[in-house]
């Protein structure tokens, strides 16, 4: 088991961001080294957390600026496991849960003034997990990997406006790598195999400028073959 506490600062041309971090957890490894389990509970308390937001200034212009959220916090749980089914095959499973909130976040200099107090922190799904299956041939000449990851819905902007929300989604990836020699290999792959449509970033515009935003999406399904020669 373990317990840690740390304090850190992030500097810039604005108030320093301060973080008090506390973690309590356990680590386990079986006697045959086939099973590894790490679990931890954490609490992160931020003071003046730095956030980049596009706002309308008092002069009426649109500007992207860095602001300090007065108080914000994140609590959660992490679980990481590895299990070797055989000498050649392993399963990895990771799970994360978090509860986040801006305890105090007001921008009085924006027009109109903005109040994000009580909102969920951006890019913070309540739960997420990923699982992967990896098997290696007896002679180490080929590797098959199948992976799936999932995230609950979350917001990409501290305003928590609907346009910045990403619905829950899952992504599957598959790859097979064959080593012919020390310097030649071939990889057959499929990324985002179910062709999931999901956002990777959202730029939101201030309400006096229409209140809309610009969405950036992940790559669609890709299937291909890579042949690599190293020198």
Region locations from a protein language model:
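C-terminal beta-signal and adjacent terminal beta-strands/loops
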Residues: 149-156, 177-231
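Repeated loop/turn-to-beta-strand initiation elements of outer-membrane beta-barrel proteins
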Residues: 1, 32-37, 88-91, 139-144, ...
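Gram-negative outer-membrane beta-barrel transporters
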Residues: 45, 67-159, 194, 228
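Transmembrane beta-barrel architecture of outer-membrane proteins
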Residues: 19-23, 72-80, 124-130, 169-173, ...
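Membrane-embedded beta-strand positions of outer-membrane beta-barrel proteins
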Residues: 3, 24, 37-41, 81, ...
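Surface-exposed extracellular loop regions of Gram-negative outer-membrane beta-barrel proteins
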Residues: 1-28, 32-37, 41-67, 106-109, ...
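Surface-exposed loop and edge beta-strand positions of immunoglobulin-like domains
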Residues: 15-17, 27, 42, 70, ...
